[in-house]
């Protein structure tokens, strides 16, 4: 082999080696660049999560301050302060069911696109609810934007049809008029136990000629047109109905809270502690107050940029601030907004932000709950929800665990804030502590209703644990939180019974 050949071969070998080194360097740089990009993505995700953790933090001291603010706003509302966020509406319910009620009573529950008609046969303290029946009726969409007469005539006609199906289990004493409790879950200025004028329609209703009118009178005239002899003896909202239903089962029920799509609370107040009450005090000495607590607001509430943006984009900015932090309508939406931030800032679901994640209210709270309760080792159920709802085909295990943590942060804040509100009611009633005079502790029951509380187990568990923590071990031993499943419907019938025109002759 000649010298030239050897040199040439050496040059080729060196060139190949250099090329290999070059490729290795490029590959190494790409790997390092990819690794650095991944580390940067994780750093950004951690920064977003850390900020959420800080802004959503609800230490016990903060919750006590929120409860104090709740008490202050309750007192302002009871004084009729025009600027008070809590309206503290007088319900005119001063006689709650005792369990002694007898007879046949009806209820009409109108609060959305459906309404329910209910009848119960009450058998007194021994037999309680002897029989109960109900029917649910969908309201045709055109009646939700029609006239007042058309809507109430439709309701009265359905009520009359329901009355005609009374069976042998239901008995009306001869010579007596049927009586009805009317649950009307729209803003009303109540003027007596059986009258109230509509302030405004909500929930998709827009009917001319009803605002400012007495809704009981509207229903009564419609029943007369149908030839239905029935008297409305109680007009209540759903939270007051839940309180009545709870009291019928347990005489120690002092308040009711609804935690569902929306939220509200009602409680039994001493009538002499209501400065805006005019006229004679009720014989019972008590009055049920409808707090409309969803509108509670305070600088102490731990609001974040996500809350502020949600409120700004809502149909009622500046209103229902508390509701927007704790109710089922909004918890899933808050989670969506945080996930969207993570998708934009930290590519949580890949380089492209899922289109559906931009859609407001696409993530409902029941879906959030299902993800939050996933106990599989790889969070496969959570991943399936993200795929079905947001269209994300493949999510990393890290992305799923981050989503789970976001659900936990939002649910925990909501539950702890709700517990602070309940603690505020207990403080207002003086039921938040052990009697200092050594007298016997008074048992206090809070009736809770609504799908959020009933079905979202982690929310419910957190709420109850937080309330116990706020009360302290000794005081907590005399406070009971009890599910009052669907109490508002039967509660209206029970209030019709306790305010019956025949009650004095029983």
From Swiss-Prot:
GO terms for molecular function: ATP binding; D-glucose binding; fructokinase activity; glucokinase activity. The chain crosses the membrane at residues 6-26. The keyword Transferase applies. Pathway: Carbohydrate metabolism; hexose metabolism; Carbohydrate degradation; glycolysis; D-glyceraldehyde 3-phosphate and glycerone phosphate from D-glucose: step 1/4. Signal peptide: none annotated. It catalyses: a D-hexose + ATP = a D-hexose 6-phosphate + ADP + H(+); D-fructose + ATP = D-fructose 6-phosphate + ADP + H(+); D-glucose + ATP = D-glucose 6-phosphate + ADP + H(+). The keyword Transmembrane helix applies. InterPro entries: ATPase_NBD, Hexokinase, Hexokinase_BS, Hexokinase_C, Hexokinase_N. One of its GO terms (biological process) is intracellular glucose homeostasis. Keywords: ATP-binding, Chloroplast, Glycolysis, Kinase, Membrane, Nucleotide-binding, Plastid, Plastid outer membrane, Transferase, Transmembrane, Transmembrane helix. Its EC number is 2.7.1.1. Expressed in roots, leaves, flowers, immature seeds and endosperm. Gene3D superfamilies: 3.30.420.40, 3.40.367.20. Plants over-expressing HXK6 exhibit hypersensitive plant growth retardation and enhanced repression of the photosynthetic gene RbcS in response to glucose treatment. This is Hexokinase-6.
